[in-house]
Protein backbone atom coordinates (compact mmCIF):
# COMPACT_ATOMS: atom_id res chain seq x y z
CA UNK A 1 0.00 0.00 0.00
CA UNK A 2 1.36 3.40 -1.00
CA UNK A 3 2.10 5.79 1.86
CA UNK A 4 0.87 9.38 1.47
CA UNK A 5 1.96 12.55 3.26
CA UNK A 6 -0.45 15.49 3.36
CA UNK A 7 0.69 19.09 3.73
CA UNK A 8 -1.72 22.00 3.85
CA UNK A 9 -2.72 25.33 5.28
CA UNK A 10 -5.79 26.82 6.90
CA UNK A 11 -8.72 27.20 4.53
CA UNK A 12 -12.10 28.84 4.34
CA UNK A 13 -14.82 26.99 6.24
CA UNK A 14 -16.84 26.29 3.07
CA UNK A 15 -14.00 24.12 1.79
CA UNK A 16 -14.06 21.93 4.87
CA UNK A 17 -16.49 19.38 3.44
CA UNK A 18 -14.32 18.84 0.35
CA UNK A 19 -11.17 18.48 2.44
CA UNK A 20 -12.81 15.91 4.72
CA UNK A 21 -14.26 14.01 1.74
CA UNK A 22 -10.80 13.65 0.20
CA UNK A 23 -9.14 12.40 3.38
CA UNK A 24 -12.04 10.03 4.14
CA UNK A 25 -11.69 8.57 0.64
CA UNK A 26 -8.05 7.83 1.39
CA UNK A 27 -8.97 6.34 4.78
CA UNK A 28 -11.59 4.05 3.21
CA UNK A 29 -8.96 2.74 0.81
CA UNK A 30 -6.73 1.84 3.76
CA UNK A 31 -4.04 4.31 2.73
CA UNK A 32 -1.35 4.93 5.39
CA UNK A 33 -1.55 8.69 6.00
CA UNK A 34 1.00 11.05 7.50
CA UNK A 35 -0.27 14.59 8.07
CA UNK A 36 1.67 17.78 8.71
CA UNK A 37 1.32 18.89 12.32
CA UNK A 38 -0.03 22.39 11.61
CA UNK A 39 -2.52 21.09 9.05
CA UNK A 40 -3.70 18.37 11.43
CA UNK A 41 -4.28 21.02 14.08
CA UNK A 42 -6.48 22.91 11.61
CA UNK A 43 -8.46 19.75 10.82
CA UNK A 44 -9.10 19.06 14.50
CA UNK A 45 -9.72 22.56 15.78
CA UNK A 46 -11.46 24.26 12.86
CA UNK A 47 -13.23 21.34 11.18
CA UNK A 48 -13.71 19.07 14.22
CA UNK A 49 -12.26 16.29 12.08
CA UNK A 50 -10.01 13.60 13.56
CA UNK A 51 -8.66 11.45 10.73
CA UNK A 52 -7.07 8.06 11.29
CA UNK A 53 -3.37 8.54 10.60
CA UNK A 54 -0.10 6.66 10.91
CA UNK A 55 1.91 9.64 12.03
CA UNK A 56 2.20 13.39 12.56
CA UNK A 57 5.05 14.99 10.62
CA UNK A 58 6.94 18.27 10.59
CA UNK A 59 9.22 17.31 7.71
CA UNK A 60 8.80 14.83 4.88
CA UNK A 61 9.83 11.24 5.80
CA UNK A 62 11.93 9.31 3.30
CA UNK A 63 9.55 6.33 3.13
CA UNK A 64 6.64 8.33 1.66
CA UNK A 65 5.44 7.37 -1.84
CA UNK A 66 3.24 10.37 -2.70
CA UNK A 67 2.68 13.86 -1.33
CA UNK A 68 -0.64 15.69 -1.42
CA UNK A 69 -0.53 19.46 -1.01
CA UNK A 70 -3.81 21.17 -0.06
CA UNK A 71 -3.65 24.93 -0.48
CA UNK A 72 -2.70 27.61 -2.96
CA UNK A 73 0.53 28.34 -4.78
CA UNK A 74 2.27 29.49 -1.60
CA UNK A 75 1.52 26.20 0.14
CA UNK A 76 2.65 24.30 -2.96
CA UNK A 77 6.00 26.12 -2.95
CA UNK A 78 6.46 25.36 0.74
CA UNK A 79 5.68 21.69 0.06
CA UNK A 80 8.12 21.62 -2.87
CA UNK A 81 10.79 22.87 -0.46
CA UNK A 82 9.94 19.98 1.89
CA UNK A 83 10.29 17.47 -0.97
CA UNK A 84 13.76 18.80 -1.73
CA UNK A 85 15.97 16.38 -3.63
CA UNK A 86 13.86 13.28 -2.88
CA UNK A 87 11.78 13.63 -6.07
CA UNK A 88 8.71 12.15 -4.36
CA UNK A 89 5.74 12.93 -6.67
CA UNK A 90 3.38 15.65 -5.45
CA UNK A 91 -0.30 16.26 -6.18
CA UNK A 92 -1.50 19.83 -5.78
CA UNK A 93 -5.11 20.31 -4.63
CA UNK A 94 -6.19 23.93 -4.97
CA UNK A 95 -8.00 25.46 -2.03
CA UNK A 96 -6.55 28.93 -2.58
CA UNK A 97 -7.35 31.67 -5.05
CA UNK A 98 -5.27 31.35 -8.22
CA UNK A 99 -3.77 27.90 -7.78
CA UNK A 100 -1.60 28.10 -10.88
CA UNK A 101 0.65 25.24 -9.80
CA UNK A 102 -2.05 22.95 -8.43
CA UNK A 103 -3.65 20.25 -10.58
CA UNK A 104 -7.20 19.83 -9.29
CA UNK A 105 -9.75 21.98 -7.49
CA UNK A 106 -10.74 21.03 -3.97
CA UNK A 107 -14.38 20.21 -4.79
CA UNK A 108 -13.40 17.57 -7.38
CA UNK A 109 -10.41 16.06 -5.60
CA UNK A 110 -12.30 13.26 -3.83
CA UNK A 111 -13.68 12.06 -7.17
CA UNK A 112 -10.28 12.05 -8.87
CA UNK A 113 -8.22 10.64 -6.01
CA UNK A 114 -9.05 7.05 -7.02
CA UNK A 115 -6.82 7.57 -10.04
CA UNK A 116 -3.89 8.25 -7.74
CA UNK A 117 -4.57 5.09 -5.73
CA UNK A 118 -4.88 3.04 -8.93
CA UNK A 119 -1.69 4.49 -10.42
CA UNK A 120 -3.74 6.04 -13.23
CA UNK A 121 -1.83 9.30 -13.60
CA UNK A 122 1.06 10.92 -15.41
CA UNK A 123 4.13 12.70 -14.09
CA UNK A 124 5.14 16.16 -15.27
CA UNK A 125 8.64 17.26 -14.37
CA UNK A 126 9.54 20.85 -13.54
CA UNK A 127 13.06 22.25 -13.52
CA UNK A 128 14.50 23.81 -10.38
CA UNK A 129 17.09 26.47 -9.65
CA UNK A 130 20.14 25.55 -7.62
CA UNK A 131 21.36 28.58 -5.68
CA UNK A 132 24.78 28.66 -4.03
CA UNK A 133 26.37 31.42 -2.00
CA UNK A 134 30.14 31.88 -2.27
CA UNK A 135 30.47 31.65 1.51
CA UNK A 136 30.65 27.86 1.38
CA UNK A 137 27.06 27.17 2.42
CA UNK A 138 25.12 24.21 1.03
CA UNK A 139 23.02 24.75 -2.12
CA UNK A 140 19.39 25.82 -1.85
CA UNK A 141 16.68 25.14 -4.40
CA UNK A 142 13.74 27.06 -5.85
CA UNK A 143 10.86 25.97 -8.06
CA UNK A 144 9.75 29.45 -9.11
CA UNK A 145 12.50 32.00 -8.70
CA UNK A 146 15.44 33.48 -6.90
CA UNK A 147 15.13 37.22 -6.33
CA UNK A 148 17.78 39.66 -5.20
CA UNK A 149 16.10 42.68 -3.65
CA UNK A 150 17.18 45.87 -1.98
CA UNK A 151 16.83 46.05 1.77
CA UNK A 152 16.31 49.80 2.05
CA UNK A 153 13.26 51.34 0.39
CA UNK A 154 14.83 54.70 -0.43
CA UNK A 155 17.61 53.64 -2.79
CA UNK A 156 18.39 51.20 -5.58
CA UNK A 157 20.92 48.41 -5.65
CA UNK A 158 23.28 47.43 -8.45
CA UNK A 159 23.31 43.77 -9.45
CA UNK A 160 26.24 42.79 -11.66
CA UNK A 161 25.37 39.74 -13.75
CA UNK A 162 27.66 37.30 -15.55
CA UNK A 163 26.58 34.43 -17.79
CA UNK A 164 29.10 31.56 -17.89
CA UNK A 165 31.78 34.02 -16.67
CA UNK A 166 30.89 36.41 -19.52
CA UNK A 167 29.92 39.82 -18.12
CA UNK A 168 26.35 40.75 -19.05
CA UNK A 169 25.33 44.02 -17.41
CA UNK A 170 24.89 46.01 -14.23
CA UNK A 171 21.24 46.19 -13.23
CA UNK A 172 20.46 49.40 -11.34
CA UNK A 173 17.04 48.57 -9.97
CA UNK A 174 14.99 47.58 -6.97
CA UNK A 175 16.11 44.04 -7.63
CA UNK A 176 16.57 41.22 -10.12
CA UNK A 177 14.51 38.05 -10.51
CA UNK A 178 15.90 34.85 -12.02
CA UNK A 179 12.91 32.66 -12.82
CA UNK A 180 12.34 29.13 -14.09
CA UNK A 181 9.56 28.40 -16.61
CA UNK A 182 7.33 27.60 -13.61
CA UNK A 183 8.19 30.97 -12.10
CA UNK A 184 7.66 32.90 -15.33
CA UNK A 185 3.98 33.31 -14.37
CA UNK A 186 4.84 34.56 -10.87
CA UNK A 187 7.06 37.45 -9.68
CA UNK A 188 8.81 37.73 -13.05
CA UNK A 189 5.49 38.28 -14.81
CA UNK A 190 4.75 41.30 -12.63
CA UNK A 191 8.00 42.81 -13.95
CA UNK A 192 6.80 42.34 -17.56
CA UNK A 193 8.78 39.14 -17.99
CA UNK A 194 7.66 36.66 -20.66
CA UNK A 195 5.58 33.56 -20.00
CA UNK A 196 7.65 30.45 -20.74
CA UNK A 197 6.10 27.05 -21.43
CA UNK A 198 6.99 24.55 -18.64
CA UNK A 199 8.77 22.16 -21.03
CA UNK A 200 11.16 24.87 -22.27
CA UNK A 201 14.69 24.71 -20.93
CA UNK A 202 15.25 28.35 -20.13
CA UNK A 203 15.64 30.86 -17.34
CA UNK A 204 14.55 34.48 -17.51
CA UNK A 205 16.34 37.42 -15.87
CA UNK A 206 13.79 40.13 -15.05
CA UNK A 207 14.81 43.45 -13.46
CA UNK A 208 12.43 44.93 -10.91
CA UNK A 209 11.75 48.65 -11.51
CA UNK A 210 15.02 49.24 -13.42
CA UNK A 211 16.44 52.75 -13.54
CA UNK A 212 17.20 52.40 -17.27
CA UNK A 213 14.34 51.89 -19.74
CA UNK A 214 16.48 49.66 -21.98
CA UNK A 215 17.03 47.01 -19.30
CA UNK A 216 14.51 44.42 -20.48
CA UNK A 217 13.88 40.82 -19.38
CA UNK A 218 16.33 38.36 -20.92
CA UNK A 219 15.72 34.66 -21.66
CA UNK A 220 18.79 32.41 -21.42
CA UNK A 221 19.32 28.63 -21.82
CA UNK A 222 19.03 26.78 -18.53
CA UNK A 223 22.49 25.27 -18.92
CA UNK A 224 23.81 28.78 -18.28
CA UNK A 225 25.63 29.43 -15.00
CA UNK A 226 24.55 32.83 -13.68
CA UNK A 227 26.72 34.74 -11.25
CA UNK A 228 25.29 37.77 -9.42
CA UNK A 229 27.21 40.30 -7.34
CA UNK A 230 25.56 43.14 -5.43
CA UNK A 231 26.67 46.70 -4.81
CA UNK A 232 24.50 48.77 -2.48
CA UNK A 233 24.59 51.73 -0.12
CA UNK A 234 23.29 49.30 2.44
CA UNK A 235 25.67 46.66 3.76
CA UNK A 236 23.14 43.93 3.06
CA UNK A 237 20.61 42.74 0.51
CA UNK A 238 17.77 40.23 0.47
CA UNK A 239 17.87 36.86 -1.25
CA UNK A 240 14.35 35.47 -1.70
CA UNK A 241 13.84 31.87 -2.85
CA UNK A 242 10.18 31.07 -3.51
CA UNK A 243 9.18 33.46 -0.73
CA UNK A 244 11.82 32.28 1.75
CA UNK A 245 13.87 35.36 2.65
CA UNK A 246 17.31 35.76 4.12
CA UNK A 247 19.66 38.70 4.49
CA UNK A 248 23.16 38.51 3.02
CA UNK A 249 26.13 40.90 3.17
CA UNK A 250 26.94 42.69 -0.07
CA UNK A 251 30.27 40.91 -0.41
CA UNK A 252 28.43 37.58 -0.85
CA UNK A 253 27.93 36.67 -4.49
CA UNK A 254 25.34 34.20 -5.76
CA UNK A 255 25.73 31.38 -8.27
CA UNK A 256 22.60 30.06 -10.00
CA UNK A 257 22.21 27.07 -12.31
CA UNK A 258 19.79 24.30 -13.18
CA UNK A 259 19.43 21.81 -10.35
CA UNK A 260 20.46 18.20 -11.06
CA UNK A 261 17.01 16.98 -9.93
CA UNK A 262 13.46 18.01 -10.81
CA UNK A 263 10.10 18.37 -9.10
CA UNK A 264 7.71 15.59 -10.15
CA UNK A 265 4.10 16.78 -10.34
CA UNK A 266 1.21 14.31 -10.45
CA UNK A 267 -1.39 14.90 -13.18
CA UNK A 268 -4.66 13.00 -12.67
CA UNK A 269 -6.06 14.02 -16.04
CA UNK A 270 -4.78 15.38 -19.36
CA UNK A 271 -3.13 18.72 -18.69
CA UNK A 272 -2.92 21.64 -21.09
CA UNK A 273 -0.79 24.66 -20.24
CA UNK A 274 -2.76 26.68 -22.80
CA UNK A 275 -5.98 25.83 -20.95
CA UNK A 276 -4.35 26.87 -17.68
CA UNK A 277 -3.44 30.25 -19.17
CA UNK A 278 -7.00 30.79 -20.35
CA UNK A 279 -8.63 29.64 -17.14
CA UNK A 280 -6.24 31.02 -14.53
CA UNK A 281 -4.89 34.17 -16.21
CA UNK A 282 -7.91 34.95 -18.41
CA UNK A 283 -5.55 34.63 -21.40
CA UNK A 284 -7.10 36.31 -24.44
CA UNK A 285 -10.40 36.95 -22.67
CA UNK A 286 -12.33 40.07 -23.65
CA UNK A 287 -12.72 41.52 -20.16
CA UNK A 288 -14.73 44.72 -20.18
From Swiss-Prot:
User: Quick one: which residues bind NAD(+)?
Assistant: 73-74, 78, 144-145, 174, 185-190, 209
Task: Tell me the Pfam families matching this sequence.
Answer: NAD_kinase, NAD_kinase_C
Enumerate the GO terms in the molecular function aspect: ATP binding; metal ion binding; NAD binding; NAD+ kinase activity
GO cellular component terms listed in the entry, alphabetical order: cytoplasm
User: What EC number(s) does its UniProt record assign?
Assistant: 2.7.1.23
Q: InterPro entries in the record, alphabetically?
A: ATP-NAD_kinase_N, ATP-NAD_kinase_PpnK-typ_C, NAD/diacylglycerol_kinase_sf, NADK
The active site is formed by 73 (proton acceptor)
One GO BP:
NADP biosynthetic process
- Recite the UniProt keywords alphabetically: ATP-binding, Cytoplasm, Kinase, NAD, NADP, Nucleotide-binding, Transferase
Its main localization is cytoplasm
Q: Where in the cell is it found?
A: Cytoplasm
What does the record give as the function of this protein?
Involved in the regulation of the intracellular balance of NAD and NADP, and is a key enzyme in the biosynthesis of NADP. Catalyzes specifically the phosphorylation on 2'-hydroxyl of the adenosine moiety of NAD to yield NADP.
What is the similarity comment for this entry?
Belongs to the NAD kinase family.
- This chain's protein is named NAD kinase
> Where does this protein come from, organism-wise?
Porphyromonas gingivalis (strain ATCC BAA-308 / W83)
Amino acid sequence: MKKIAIFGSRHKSEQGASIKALILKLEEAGTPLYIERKFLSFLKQDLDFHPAICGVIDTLPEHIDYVICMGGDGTFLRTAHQIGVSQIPVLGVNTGRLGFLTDVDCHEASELITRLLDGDFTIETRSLLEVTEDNGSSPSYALNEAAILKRETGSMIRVNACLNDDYLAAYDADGLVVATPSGSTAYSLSGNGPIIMPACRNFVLTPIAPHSLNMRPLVVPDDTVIRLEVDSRSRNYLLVLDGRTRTLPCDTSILLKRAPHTLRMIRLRPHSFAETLRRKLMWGAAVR
